[in-house]
């Protein structure tokens, strides 16, 4: 389904852009506060895990 929507740009963009733009402005600000407070631990845990594996040398030197 994702491929079909991407290829049909003329019709999908006109309808999806208008709906997403109106919702994105109002809902993005409200969801950012809720997600940041609730899932802040999960996101930080995942980011720390990746940062240690990728930037293990840089992290040790900085600390």
Swiss-Prot record:
It is found in: Nucleus; Chromosome. It comes from the Eukaryota. Residues 1-63 are annotated as: Disordered. One of its GO terms (biological process) is sperm DNA condensation. GO terms for cellular component: nucleosome; nucleus. Signal peptide: none annotated. Testis. GO terms for molecular function: DNA binding. Protamines substitute for histones in the chromatin of sperm during the haploid phase of spermatogenesis. They compact sperm DNA into a highly condensed, stable and inactive complex. Belongs to the protamine P1 family. This is Sperm protamine P1. It comes from Antechinus stuartii (Brown marsupial mouse).
């Amino acid at each position: 389904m994702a491929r079909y929507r991407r290829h049909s740009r003329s019709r999908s963009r006109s309808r999806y852009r208008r709906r997403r733009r109106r919702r994105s402005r109002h809902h993005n600000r409200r969801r950012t506060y809720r997600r940041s407070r609730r899932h802040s631990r999960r996101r930080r845990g995942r980011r720390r895990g990746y940062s240690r594996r990728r930037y293990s040398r840089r992290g040790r030197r900085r600390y």
